[in-house]
Amino acid sequence: MGGKMLRSVSELIYKVYARYLLGQINLNNLPGHVALIVDGNRRWARKEKRDRISDGHRAGAGKAVDFLHWCDELDINIVTLYLLSNDNLKNRNRQELNDLVQVICDLIAQVSKRWKVNHVGSCENLPELLGNSLEGVKSSTKTNRYSERSMTVNLAIGYSGRAEITEAVRKIVNTYPIGDLPEKITEEVISANLYTGGLSDPDLIIRTSGEQRLSDFMPWQSTHSEFYFLEALGPDLRKVDFLRAIRDFSIRRRSFGA
């Protein structure tokens, strides 16, 4: 009985604190585009003494879905999840990569049922199963079965910021005559040819696990982004952590490089 009572009190305190944080947020200054770097899944699996690293990836994916719901509750327009980098594809062992691919495929299926989904990244080196899942997302998005107000979710899979910029420049070089290139290679043209062309840059980038770096994530688009680094590992992310990040953003005065 004592344990149940303690849990009930803890849950009540948590709910009260969450409402308090929500009340402190300036709802007139919310980010239009939030990005989440999901990090710490493997460390979480080791910390929890799980037999399989994939348990950490699956727990992190579940928390990413929670994160999307939290963003949707605040009417945030665009959310980007950094799920799989080019470096992950190159450096993870085969078994872990296979498990991770299955987790991401399940995540894609779940997310695409509720929100508009874009793939941000290259399909070139993706495992066939993952490539097919992303192709399925393209087809479902084309059916226009989502409302105009539906949140857009970008899934950064097979993503590298350096590769993205390189590919954008190549597109431009292959599109225009050599003599026109000096005038055509502008910030606006490069932005339009990125994987995220046509979408706004992230206003707020959140990273879990205590690491304070971007890890090749949107180096071009994050020029004027605000950053919020959390100590919590990906699977341990809580709604109050999210609300603190949003509260912090909502009271900042952004300089945009001025």
UniProtKB/Swiss-Prot annotation:
GO BP annotation list: polyprenol biosynthetic process
Annotated binding of substrate, by residue: 40-44, 52, 57, 85-87, 92, 207, 213-215
Binding locations of Mg(2+): D39, E226
Cofactor annotation: Mg(2+)
Protein EC: 2.5.1.-
Keyword Magnesium: yes
Positions of the catalytic residues: D39, N88
Classification via Pfam families: Prenyltransf
Enzyme class: transferase
Keywords assigned by UniProt, alphabetized: Magnesium, Metal-binding, Transferase
GO terms assigned for molecular function: ditrans,polycis-polyprenyl diphosphate synthase [(2E,6E)-farnesyl diphosphate specific] activity; magnesium ion binding
Protein family per UniProt: Belongs to the UPP synthase family.
Function according to Swiss-Prot or TrEMBL: Catalyzes the condensation of isopentenyl diphosphate (IPP) with allylic pyrophosphates generating different type of terpenoids.
Self-association state and partner proteins as the record states: Homodimer.
Alphabetical list of HAMAP family matching this protein: ISPT
Name of the protein: Isoprenyl transferase 2
Species of the source: Tropheryma whipplei (strain Twist)
Gene assigned in the entry: uppS2
